[in-house]
């Protein structure tokens, strides 16, 4: 009887350890680290992939929409949505843009996001000159809300419970 109780206690301990380890791995799957980029450049940059292409995006919870530089679309799989809109510059000039949907991955997790296509060359070149970082667009609040991501600057990670 004592042996049976010891075996039962051991089995319970093994199950608890297994659930804890599984929870830690699951948590890692739901995290995006931007710590290295933040240390190097001062910017929260995350590298996604689409096939062999590495896609560096700036995480910006203040941007309502995700935006991609028009020059980078040629090399990527994307599907225009047919939706168009105007973007107004600081000088008051209006530029017509369109939206496209782009699939990409981070580690083994797949995402699809609708991006506003804009010529970001001057902004990207200025950031590159100041910080040395090269990125192709901005992941905005639309993505963060859709996938329930929170930016944690204490841990330098974006994480989700979804």
Specify the residue positions occupied by each region the protein language model found.
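Pepsin/retropepsin-fold aspartyl endopeptidases
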Residues: 1-162
